[in-house]
């Protein structure tokens, strides 16, 4: 006589959590941090079409790691929810906290009720409306629906421990944009699995900001020459090193 296979609820939750954590850890890292004029998103992402960072609404941004199809569905659903709320009520009624709570409820339901949890981790950020003075809000939402507000920065995906340790040492409140980009990129470069420090350039970075000084839509991507201009020393050092390598020994 064969007995039906039984697994305790505790073991089932542990296995779901392990599956989700492993999937998230395989992804490349994303950093979101508050700076003087809003929120900066920096993602290690060589793809120009599969984006990890996007706008959700006028003053709200989104970043994610994990399975692209899963977090892209969540991103699209969040945009539809925000548009519906803004149309039915007021655009100012759509907040980052509201969207973070919706994502937390959705991921919590998926984690407990569906056969497989989503292998994703999300960040929802909001800046103050134009002319208002309010600190940026950063929310981290994990695969099981847990939600936490972070005062300064959020690190997701990949090897997060060295990146967090680097940011704990180097993060500065109210930094200018160029300084904030340097801090975030330096932290991402410390997150490799190997012993050697990696070098990340414009071709491997996805960078965007929520700029509180913009009148309505705060989200703006930084690409091409604008991104290169934020990393002048890095480019100059690379050119100097290349020139030294090409120069024959005397």
From Swiss-Prot:
GO CC terms of this entry: cytoplasm; proteasome core complex, alpha-subunit complex
Keywords on record: Cytoplasm, Proteasome
Principal location: cytoplasm
Subcellular location(s) of the protein: Cytoplasm
NAD is among the record's keywords: no
PROSITE patterns to which the protein is assigned, alphabetical: PROTEASOME_ALPHA_2 (PS51475)
GO BP of this protein: modification-dependent protein catabolic process; proteasomal protein catabolic process
Regulation affecting activity: The formation of the proteasomal ATPase ARC-20S proteasome complex, likely via the docking of the C-termini of ARC into the intersubunit pockets in the alpha-rings, may trigger opening of the gate for substrate entry. Interconversion between the open-gate and close-gate conformations leads to a dynamic regulation of the 20S proteasome proteolysis activity.
GO molecular function terms noted in the UniProt entry: threonine-type endopeptidase activity
Highest taxon in the source lineage: Bacteria
Keyword Cytoplasm: yes
Annotated metabolic or biological route of this protein: Protein degradation; proteasomal Pup-dependent pathway
CDD domains referenced in this protein's UniProt entry, alphabetically: Ntn_hydrolase
Record's subunit section: The 20S proteasome core is composed of 14 alpha and 14 beta subunits that assemble into four stacked heptameric rings, resulting in a barrel-shaped structure. The two inner rings, each composed of seven catalytic beta subunits, are sandwiched by two outer rings, each composed of seven alpha subunits. The catalytic chamber with the active sites is on the inside of the barrel. Has a gated structure, the ends of the cylinder being occluded by the N-termini of the alpha-subunits. Is capped by the proteasome-associated ATPase, ARC.
Family: Belongs to the peptidase T1A family.
Function of the protein: Component of the proteasome core, a large protease complex with broad specificity involved in protein degradation.
NCBIfam families, per database record: 20S_bact_alpha
HAMAP family assigned to the protein according to its UniProt record, in alphabetical order: Proteasome_A_B
Name of the protein in question: Proteasome subunit alpha
Gene name of this polypeptide: prcA
């Amino acid at each position: 006589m064969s007995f039906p296979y039984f697994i305790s609820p505790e073991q089932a939750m542990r296995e779901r959590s392990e599956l989700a954590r492993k999937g998230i850890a395989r992804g490349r890292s994303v950093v979101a941090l508050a700076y003087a004029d809003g929120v900066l998103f920096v993602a290690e992402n060589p793809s120009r079409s599969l984006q990890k960072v996007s706008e959700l609404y006028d003053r709200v941004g989104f970043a994610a790691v994990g399975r692209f199809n899963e977090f892209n569905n969540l991103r699209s659903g969040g945009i539809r929810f925000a548009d519906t709320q803004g149309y039915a009520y007021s655009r100012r009624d759509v907040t980052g906290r509201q969207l973070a709570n919706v994502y937390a409820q959705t991921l919590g339901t998926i984690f407990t009720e569906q056969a497989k949890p989503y292998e994703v981790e999300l960040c929802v950020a909001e800046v103050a409306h134009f002319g208002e003075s309010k600190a940026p809000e950063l929310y981290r939402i994990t695969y099981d629906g847990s939600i936490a507000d972070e005062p300064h920065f959020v690190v997701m995906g990949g090897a997060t421990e060295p990146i967090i340790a680097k940011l704990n040492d180097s993060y500065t409140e109210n930094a200018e944009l160029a300084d904030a980009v340097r801090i975030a990129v330096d932290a991402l470069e410390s997150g490799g699995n190997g012993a050697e420090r990696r070098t990340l350039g414009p071709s491997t970075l996805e960078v965007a900001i929520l700029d509180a000084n913009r009148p309505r839509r705060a989200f703006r991507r930084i690409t091409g020459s604008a991104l290169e201009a934020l990393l002048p020393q890095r480019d100059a050092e690379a050119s100097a090193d290349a020139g030294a390598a090409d120069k024959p020994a005397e």
